[in-house]
Amino acid sequence: MNKNIKFTVLVIGLLLLLLLVYSNHFNNGFYFDDSHTISNNESIRDLSNVWSFFTDASTFSSLPANQAYRPMVTLMNAFDYWAAGGLDPFYFHISIFFWYIVQLTLMFFFFKNILNLSFDNHPFVPVICLFLVGFYGLHTANAETINYIISRSDSFSTLCVIAAFVLFQQTVPRKYYLYLFPMVVGIWTKQTGVMFVPLLFLYVLLFEEDFSWKAKATKVWLSKVITAAKTTLPALIVGFTLFVVNQFIFTPSSTVSSNTTVTKWDYFMTQWYIITHYLSNFLLPMNLSADPDFTVITDFFDPRILIGLFVVVVMFLLALYSFRSRKLRGFGFGLLWFFVALLPSSSFVPLYQIANDHRTFFPYVGLVLAIGFVVCFVAIRNEKFIHKNQLIKPSLLLSAALILGLYSFGTYQRNEIWSSSETLWYDVTQKSPNNGRGHMNYGLTKMAKGEYNLALVCFNKASETIPRYSYLHINMGILNNAMGRPDDAEKSFILAQNYDKNNPEVYYHYANWLLGENRFDEAKKNVDQALVLSPAHSSAKSLLVQILSKGANTITALEIDALEIPSADKYISLSLAYYKNGMFIEAIEACNKALEINPKLPVAYNNICSSLNQLKKWGKAEAACQKAIELYPDYQLAKNNLLWAQTELIKAK
């Protein structure tokens, strides 16, 4: 069997293994931020909204605070929704996985081109690159990104960065700046795509300008840096301009981009420790969590900070030292890739989530590349020994298979954990016991099963760490209602609004509860407020239809009752129902029928006045209110309506 056939067999085998390992993830559901970006996002339900995806960041999410400018993510979500004919996660996962395979394919060529620059097209390079791609593709930590649907922003933006590099490595695409197109698409997917610019500078400096500390003259160093900067300049101009436009023009003022409750220094310092967490998960991914519970560390002399700082400094020194050797320069490039890719989330811009295991999808590309250079360097230095000893090749193949097998097993298990809300959030409570949100979400799974007492235990546990979290109070309200405690339920909904007035969810859920209590007017006010904050909130729109429908049914019942046994009180009740539903002419007619039965009814004249005010018939409204006050001199509501009418009459003169 010749080498090409053997290599093809390995490629097919690796692809089949990847499909097998991820075979149990395609029906995993929508979780966490998927709710406001996909499930409740009205914008993605019509592909005709495509243009607005690129001009209006509010189409990204139904929550104003989360409306980042990521038009490519919204476009992909809309396309998958259209293909599925609804909210079927299978189609979303198929799309994400397809692009994952494309990314892995491009990574092979990217790695191969870089390694060939350092190792002169050595025959070991393709096999080592295939192993590296397999290692990355099957890595357990990457399952956090592939399973979490809205994290397609991480995976697709990483694909775009790799694609930009592959095009840059080719003569014709580079000549015509075609490599800038995937960079632009990457930035439109997630702002981390702009990190292509500093990575490109390092790539040109190390691999094309052959930068080395061995060069004695400072002028030589400076010349190489300037040349690399010139080569990177087109990407810098486009990338920086696009980033500024996206961030300061297209991103709404309602979007919360950073956490102002912590200092920039404390956040940055804490990231040194977080980096050790990311590194440990790269080597041994045993502490993966869908929602980690890390908190900001404020003491510089905390052992975790000092250990993290030591690790970061050592990695930087290793990277710089590797620049001395042409064959190990790629090792340093890989380490610096890791840090550069982490900059958007691990620098001086504090995020509310101190750490997230799906953030490492992009940085891990660099670590895998760094490993590749070490493996290639060691293998080529021992090439004669490998060829002479007949046991070495099968041993190496077996070792590679064992490594891939172990990470594959871990990935398969993580897919299982992501298979349901209950397994996912239970895992969070075990891995991140101090995360109140994890306990709350696990409580939701218990509430869904009717295990209300267990749900209450989970919610109370959550309140120990997140007592002012609006979603906790929303869910506590839902639970109290299910347990037959309407007064406590309403208190919880009101608390949620007090803690998070700009969140449409607090109004939506309160409105939903009010609808169940047949308090239609209050329900409509709350759902209207939810839609003011989030016009694309699909659940709020559906709820509004229900409220109006049930309100209309109430009107029908009142109409029948008034016709069967007419009375002034019944017509007054009917007029109020008409008024609450914006049927002002009908409200006036009902009041007139009430006056036919009882001509001295001040409430009827007041309701006529209110309706005429709504119709902006100020003169007639004034007369009706004066009649109401004539019949009942202390009628304050009528006085208020009269003042409104008279004020408008004065304005009109």
Predicted regions and their residues:
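Polytopic membrane enzymes that build or remodel cell-surface glycoconjugates and lipids
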Residues: 1-484, 488, 494, 498-499, ...
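TPR-repeat structural position
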Residues: 418, 452, 486, 520, ...
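Hydrophobic/aromatic packing residues within the alpha-helices of TPR/SEL1-like helical repeat arrays
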Residues: 425, 459, 493, 527, ...
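Structural marker of alpha-solenoid helical repeat scaffolds
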Residues: 431, 465, 499, 533, ...
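Conserved alpha-helical positions within TPR/SEL1-like repeat arrays
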Residues: 437-447, 471-481, 505-513, 539-546, ...
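Single-residue signature of alpha-solenoid repeat helices
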Residues: 455, 489, 523, 554-557, ...
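Terminal, low-structured helical/coil segments at or just beyond the last alpha-helical repeat
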Residues: 541-569, 626, 630-653
